[in-house]
Regions:
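Phosphate/pyrophosphate-binding loop motifs in nucleotide- or prenyl diphosphate-using proteins
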Residues: 1-179
Length: 179
């Protein structure tokens, strides 16, 4: 059964059996991570087939990231031993992909861009902003609750999403507007 009625008065169950308020920092973190995950799914849906064909590495990273976000959410609510924990290799994969984007598409940082361009690039910007919020929310939980690798992963992910928005616009032939 999907509904239990146990949350009708502003509390919810954590994985360890503890109840907490729905306004608890842990639930704020889980909510931001869930929202980010949904926007990453939307981003993938908005890629044209032509652009998607040129983003195979990035798409695979996003799919891995979606699984990782569930794991970080589980960390936030004290779920034991959840699968898909972020690793140093996941962080390295983001970094290597960003390095390749900068090299192959000359996407070095030379000033801020106004979020927009094609729809998929704009969605990458939305996901980037939500990622920053999720990162702040997980930091509020403290390093005891969230392992350093997860916090570092979220930090790199927002940088990746910024570069991805730029690459999508470049592949779409959409001119970006500098601030």
């Amino acid at each position: 059964m999907i509904y239990t009625r146990t949350g009708d008065h502003g509390t919810t169950d954590l994985a360890n059996g503890e109840r907490c308020k729905k306004t608890d920092d842990r639930m704020e973190a889980v909510g931001a991570l869930d929202e980010l995950n949904a926007h990453l799914g939307l981003l993938l849906c908005q890629l044209s087939p032509e652009i998607s064909d040129k983003l195979k590495t990035e798409t695979a990273l996003i799919l891995r990231t979606q699984r990782i976000l569930f794991a970080i959410g589980a960390q936030a609510v004290a779920a034991p031993n959840s699968a898909n924990q972020p690793t140093d290799e996941d962080i390295e994969a983001l970094e290597k992909t960003m390095d390749a984007m900068v090299k192959d598409h000359e996407l070095r940082f030379d000033g801020f861009r106004i979020p927009g361009g094609c729809t998929a690039a704009a969605e990458a910007h939305v996901a980037r902003c939500i990622c920053r919020r999720a990162e702040r929310a997980t930091w509020r939980l403290g390093e005891e609750a969230i392992p350093a690798c997860s916090l570092i992963f979220l930090n790199r992910l927002s940088d990746f999403l910024y570069l991805l928005s730029r690459k999508i616009n470049a592949l779409a032939g959409t001119e970006e507007k500098k601030v």
